[in-house]
Amino acid sequence: MIEQTIFEYLGGKLSVPVRMEEEPDMPDEYVLIEKTGGEKTNYISRATIAIQSYAKSLYRAMQINEDVKAALEEIVTLDEISRCSLNSDYNYTDTTRKKYRYQAVFDIVHY
């Protein structure tokens, strides 16, 4: 599963916790991974992955987002990843829960 690969990879690269879902008592700073789409043709899989960076300030959420982008630029060094490109990234503050958040969306080709 591509989510597991990204989870393990980012867990070793980032200074904040990486999660695949919200848990009780989340820390002030963390990253969530979510697969938002994908397809498979001729044994080659493509996935769209959204990575949300949370923090107590908008500036810190933006910094974590930059760390995520820098880390994923290097994920192609893994054998199972052949391409990773940034689709978009933007301020995605959760106004309902009053939590600062940035989101980066990546298109990943993997085996």
Predicted ranges, named:
Residues 49:
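Residue-level detector of short, conserved catalytic/binding motifs and their immediate flanks
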Residues 20, 80-91:
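Short, conserved loop-to-beta-strand elements that form functional interface hotspots
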Residues 1-41, 59, 63-70, 75, ...:
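Small/polar-rich, solvent-exposed N-terminal microdomains that initiate assembly or binding
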Residues 1-12, 25-26, 36-46, 86-111:
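Short, charged interaction patches at domain edges and termini
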Residues 52-54:
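Short hydrophobic/aromatic beta-strand micro-patches
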